């Protein structure tokens, strides 16, 4: 069980990364605080809605969990109870942010220059990373209380994982055809589920969770480069 001082240090570390990233966005893009505050609120509400959805799934699955074995229980908890509601809510709320608060910059794609288009996408990418960092910061608090084992390592890797998955929320928010949403969403769901599973099992399996984080970093960078060039 973590002490109050340890929890406070954990939260400081988590939100420090978010604050540093916000400072980078402001300096690099000369952006006002307004979109960052909106992102903070959208991410905070994503946390609350995710918790609500996960609670509903948990109560609806009580009978199933009583009869299932350890392996199926881990899979259900990591992929259905935890990852699926969370990734659905995060992708949906970020899409709402883009549609409601950024559509005026993106709707007239034929009237803006390629340089302006790249600048808009770059800013949205930076904001999507900030979105993931804020979500991870709040989530780390919940995990610190419920699952204190390996929480320090999980805090660092979780922040990076959520930040990199932000690139996929950006892609989901900007595709025009519904079928093109499926692939990036399945990726975020599957990767997040695997990450949760390895950290839930613990021991040496945590190494596989760290490998997943490095894979997501590489994949997110290449994904952004392809997305930006389209």
Name these PLM-found stretches.
Residues 1-230:
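Hydrophobic alpha-helical segments at protein termini of multi-pass membrane proteins
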């Amino acid at each position: 069980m973590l002490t109050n001082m340890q929890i406070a240090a954990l939260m400081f570390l988590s939100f420090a990364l978010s604050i540093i990233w916000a400072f980078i966005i402001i300096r690099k893009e000369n952006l006002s605080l307004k979109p960052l505050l909106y992102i903070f609120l959208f991410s905070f509400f994503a946390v609350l809605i995710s918790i609500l959805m996960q609670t509903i799934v948990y109560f609806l699955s009580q009978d199933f969990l009583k009869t299932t074995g350890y392996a199926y229980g881990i899979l259900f908890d990591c992929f259905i109870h935890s990852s699926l509601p969370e990734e659905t809510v995060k992708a949906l709320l970020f899409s709402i942010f883009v549609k409601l608060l950024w559509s005026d910059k993106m709707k007239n794609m034929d009237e803006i220059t390629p340089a302006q288009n790249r600048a808009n996408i770059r800013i949205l990418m930076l904001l999507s990373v900030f979105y993931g960092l804020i979500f991870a910061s709040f989530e780390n608090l919940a995990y610190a209380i419920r699952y204190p084992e390996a929480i320090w390592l999980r805090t660092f890797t979780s922040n990076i994982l959520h930040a990199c998955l932000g690139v996929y929320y950006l892609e989901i928010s900007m595709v025009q055809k519904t079928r093109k949403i499926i692939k990036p969403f399945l990726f975020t769901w599957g990767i997040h589920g695997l990450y949760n599973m390895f950290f839930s099992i613990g021991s040496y399996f945590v190494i596989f969770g760290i490998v997943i984080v490095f894979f997501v970093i590489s994949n997110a960078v290449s994904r952004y480069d392809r997305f930006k060039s389209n």
